[in-house]
């Protein structure tokens, strides 16, 4: 049985799994920053805009020009680079889930994964 994407008719739709999961993640984390004071000030509002619009661009990208997908991926990549360097880098790679460490001792493994997926869309666009 040959499972190569080129010969698999469902392979043409595989990118939707990444798009929908990544977009849902960023919409769910971004929209609260747009309407509520989360103690982040202007930066939080800016981050929320990038998260929500980056996600929307990823979802509408396949129906529009390739650049929309790339810009959406870039917006999310910028947020993830900021999150890694400003918040998570000093906490190491692994996430730590202990009662004493919650909520702010998470390593950057999750953010690195999200950065990698978003960079895929920056580099490949709609050809993902």
Which residue ranges define each predicted feature?
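Short, aromatic/His-centered strand-loop micro-motif at the edge of beta-sheets
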Residues: 39
């Amino acid at each position: 049985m040959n499972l190569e994407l080129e010969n698999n008719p469902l392979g043409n739709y595989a990118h939707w799994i990444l798009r929908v999961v990544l977009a849902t993640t960023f919409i769910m984390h971004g929209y609260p920053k747009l309407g509520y004071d989360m103690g982040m000030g202007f930066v939080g509002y800016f981050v929320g805009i990038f998260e929500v619009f980056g996600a929307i661009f990823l979802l509408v990208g396949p129906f529009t020009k390739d650049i929309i997908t790339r810009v959406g991926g870039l917006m999310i990549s910028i947020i993830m680079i900021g999150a890694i360097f400003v918040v998570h880098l000093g906490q190491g790679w692994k996430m730590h889930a202990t009662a004493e460490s919650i909520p702010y001792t998470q390593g950057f493994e999750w953010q690195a994964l999200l950065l990698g997926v978003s960079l895929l869309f920056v580099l490949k666009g709609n050809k993902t």
